[in-house]
Amino acid sequence: MKCCSYKIGTILDISDSFDGNYKFITIGNDPKDIYSQVRLVYSNETLIVDCEYNEISVYDLYVGNRIVAYHSNIMTMSIPPQTNALIIEVK
């Protein structure tokens, strides 16, 4: 049994939750194809690293960054699906 899955993509959007406790990071390979996108839920438990594996902040992420996101196997059935981000690696 795998503990998590991963998705490779480009950051298309970064937004805050209503209460400000979470950030939503939408990734995909085609901004016009909503069916290829995933919405990652960032929390204080999410680890973010740069290409040299140095820990960085969520504020160091930008639209257009290419990333590998390791995320929970549990996803909503919405479009795009949402899942908890465990590790985000900037390429």
State the predicted function of each range.
Residues 35-56:
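Beta-strand/loop nucleic-acid-binding surfaces
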Residues 1-32, 51-91:
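Short, flexible, surface-exposed loop segments at domain boundaries
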